[in-house]
Amino acid sequence: MEKETEAKVLLVDDEQEFLETLSSRLELRGLKVSAVTSGEQAITEAKQQDFDAIIVDLSMPGIDGLETLKRIKADNPNAEIIMLTGHASVQSGIEAMKLGAGDFLQKPVELSELMEKIGEAKDKKMLVLQKQSQEELRKILQSKSW
């Protein structure tokens, strides 16, 4: 991902050390990062702010990653969510993708790969927003009989 556009990212992981390290590394690359340690906090943050990508750990106490994914997608179907896990299984990845995750990566994640996925998520979000704007404009023009 190039530095021309700063992405806004929400990191969700119950492992505090991992969360702090990844946050710092992403911020050094020009991203604006919010970090939380639970699914509950992630759901609240996702309602209050608009993120280009939400990176969620699959295995967390309380509300796990899949439930966090479901609840965020219920509130914001266009949210771009990347799932992370230290215990990846093909079945978990399939389930996350069925629930609307844009991608699924295994820890330890390569920073370059994560940056690429964040860039893709931001690009996809921008395309969705452009399409929605075009559709709204089309409806306005039709209502005015232009």
Regions found by a protein language model. Name each.
Residues Q16-S34:
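Two-component/phosphorelay signaling modules centered on CheY-like receiver
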Residues A35-T44, G65:
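Helix N-cap/capping motif at the beta->alpha junctions
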Residues D57:
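Active-site residues of response regulator receiver
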Residues M60:
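Receiver (REC) domain active-site loop signature in two-component systems and cognate sites
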Residues V109-G119:
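C-terminal output helix
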Residues D123-W146:
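CheY-like receiver
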